């Protein structure tokens, strides 16, 4: 590689970019809404009751379908099950993308697959983290569309569905009227607020439209492993907020609880567990119970209903150590494992290099000889192939 003089290129007009930016903002401008539960039932729910009663798996799969319909249509059969959400950033792992898409399709249909934790397994830099990041960014954008409109109880740290307000004795009639089944339960926080602020009149409870945002901890939660000796399950489920206990006087009051755990941030969306097999066993059982039963149990409170999709990823070394312990067999049965290996296509490997080079500003003045990326990709692929067992064959044949 040698430094060369940059090519003289005509700069695109800035006014054109500003116009495109304004158009993008206009297209993605979502209408905020705030009202009572009575107004929600009268003005919002009748538009499409099924859409407003979606589970997290259904919501995520609808987002994937929205990307497939709203963006480029590919003729390549390898991409038939993948969506435009992935195809511009992930190369050479189409089988893994297909399996992930199929997982969400089956889970959205209500099959038992949705009661299993999705585990992405593969070597470092294989695309696992990038896949989860794209899913989170896709959810954020989808929630700003009309199709992805999401409504929650105003002020709830769990941004729970307004439909959870419907009493159990009335849910049968609700199903007959609107054609949807309610499975969620009101959280202790919202239940206490309903009693204290509204004297039990749930029709007056405020409802608002919310937008999924990792930065705002709405619909996206992330947990990264800590030192096992210092890791605290409070990072997942929260703990007593001692600063509030002094004013409230009761540690069992939901208002005295810190609802900052990752599982609460992920409610109605997705929880990413980074290097999940490095966490304590009690963490794993809590997550698997959450996946299967949609509930978590914390001290001083009854079961807390949470509807979220858990996506975990880990590397091969940690997974092999996990397999060696027999007591982990029951945990494996509750996981859907999707392998995300390195690509074995030199063309896809070269596309990865081209993407990395084009995104680095330092390479804009660097000349690359023709096919140099393809050549580097070939050598990289050869290091990933097993030695042939048949005599007379080598890795170049």
Task: Enumerate the language-model features and the residues they cover.
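Long, basic/Gly/Ser/Thr-rich N-terminal segments
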Residues: 3-56
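Conserved ASCE/P-loop NTPase catalytic core
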Residues: 42-397
């Amino acid at each position: 590689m040698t430094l060369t003089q940059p090519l003289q290129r005509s700069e695109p007009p800035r006014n054109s970019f500003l116009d495109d930016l304004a158009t993008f903002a206009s297209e993605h401008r979502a209408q905020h809404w705030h009202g009572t539960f009575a107004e929600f039932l009268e003005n919002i729910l009748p538009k499409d009751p099924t859409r407003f009663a979606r589970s997290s798996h259904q919501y995520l799969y609808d987002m994937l379908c929205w990307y497939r319909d709203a963006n480029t249509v590919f003729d390549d059969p390898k991409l038939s099950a993948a969506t435009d959400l992935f195809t511009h950033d992930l190369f050479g792992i189409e089988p893994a993308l297909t399996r992930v898409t199929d997982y969400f399709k089956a889970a959205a249909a209500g099959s038992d697959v949705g009661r299993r934790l999705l585990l992405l397994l593969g070597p470092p830099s294989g695309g696992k983290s990038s896949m989860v990041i794209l899913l989170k960014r896709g959810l954020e954008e989808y929630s700003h569309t009309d199709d992805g409109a999401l409504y929650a109880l105003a002020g709830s740290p769990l941004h729970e569905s307004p439909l959870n307000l419907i009493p159990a004795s009335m849910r049968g009639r609700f199903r007959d009227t609107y054609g949807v089944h309610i499975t969620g339960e009101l959280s202790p926080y919202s239940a206490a607020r309903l009693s204290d602020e509204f004297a039990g009149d749930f029709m007056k409870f405020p409802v608002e439209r919310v937008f999924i945002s990792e930065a705002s901890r709405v619909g996206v939660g992330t947990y990264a492993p800590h030192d096992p000796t210092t890791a605290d399950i409070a990072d997942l489920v929260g703990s007593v907020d001692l600063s509030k206990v002094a004013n409230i006087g009761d540690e069992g009051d939901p208002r005295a609880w810190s609802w900052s755990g990752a599982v609460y941030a992920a409610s109605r969306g997705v929880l990413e567990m980074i290097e999940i097999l490095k966490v304590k066993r009690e963490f794993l059982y809590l997550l698997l119970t959450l996946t299967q039963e949609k509930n978590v149990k914390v001290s001083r409170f009854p079961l807390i209903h949470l509807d979220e999709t858990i996506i975990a990823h880990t590397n091969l070394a940690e997974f092999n150590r996990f397999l060696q312990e027999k007591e982990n067999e029951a945990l494996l049965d509750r996981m859907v494992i999707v392998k995300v290996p390195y690509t074995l296509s030199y063309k896809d490997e070269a596309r990865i290099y081209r993407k990395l080079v084009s995104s680095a500003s330092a390479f804009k003045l660097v000349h690359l000889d023709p096919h140099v990326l393809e050549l580097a990709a070939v050598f990289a692929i050869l290091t990933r192939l097993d030695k042939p067992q048949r005599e007379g064959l080598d890795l170049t044949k």
